[in-house]
UniProtKB/Swiss-Prot annotation:
Gene assigned in the entry: efp
Protein localization: Cytoplasm
HAMAP family, alphabetized: EF_P (MF_00141)
Signal peptide bounds: none
Recorded GO CC terms: cytoplasm
Residue ranges the record marks as coiled coil: none
Name of this chain's protein: Elongation factor P
Any single biological process term in GO: peptide biosynthetic process
């Protein structure tokens, strides 16, 4: 489907020169003089090469048709990450470069959204929040009230984050998958 360059957003998949690219950043620039342009940074899906393109905001760009499906994470091996479609029981392997920074948050049997182009995975979307256990942090300080200061902690997936002073080792906490920030103590 052809669209104007100014309508391209992060996460869109563009087809250019017979290759697919996932958009990492898209910014519309309106200089004081001259023609407005769309600055688009994207990654080629086939080999992970990043490129940056400038289009006039009125230029036509081919946006690829993408289908989103729910998949269950099964396991990781040397070849990549393996997921199963809950409806059809089809299994698909996703390369490590597509999973990227989402890898530490994947848990067995977690339901994620995979974006597919011609049944080839091009992007992954995790749930917004995930529950993890604190495996390393400073000891709890008695008498310290809840304050806005956080102490460093390491979670069971190896991610470092800040937690409130009352959180101890072994406590299960909810964190945002986007940036690893603490949300709350788990209610389970």
């Amino acid at each position: 489907m052809r669209v104007i360059a100014s309508s391209i957003r992060k996460g869109n998949v563009i087809e250019q020169d017979g290759k697919l690219y996932v958009v990492l950043t898209a910014e519309n620039i309106h200089p004081g003089k001259g023609t407005p342009v769309s600055q688009i940074e994207m990654r080629r899906i086939s080999d992970g090469v990043k490129i940056s393109e400038r289009y006039k905001t009125t230029d036509q760009v081919e946006r690829a048709t993408i289908e989103d499906h729910n998949f269950t994470f099964l396991y990781e091996d040397g070849d990549g990450f393996h997921f199963m479609n809950a409806e059809t029981y089809d299994q698909v392997q996703v390369p490590k470069d597509i999973v990227g920074s989402a890898a530490p948050y994947l848990q067995e049997n977690m339901v994620v959204k995979l974006s597919l182009h011609d049944m080839v995975p091009v992007a992954i979307t995790l749930p917004q929040r995930v529950t993890l256990e604190v495996v390393e942090t400073e000891p709890v300080t008695k008498g310290q009230t809840a304050s806005s200061s956080y102490k460093p902690a390491v979670l069971s997936n190896g991610v470092r984050t800040g937690v409130p002073p009352h959180v101890a080792v072994g406590t299960r906490v909810v964190v945002m998958t986007e940036d690893g920030s603490y949300v709350e103590r788990a209610k389970d």
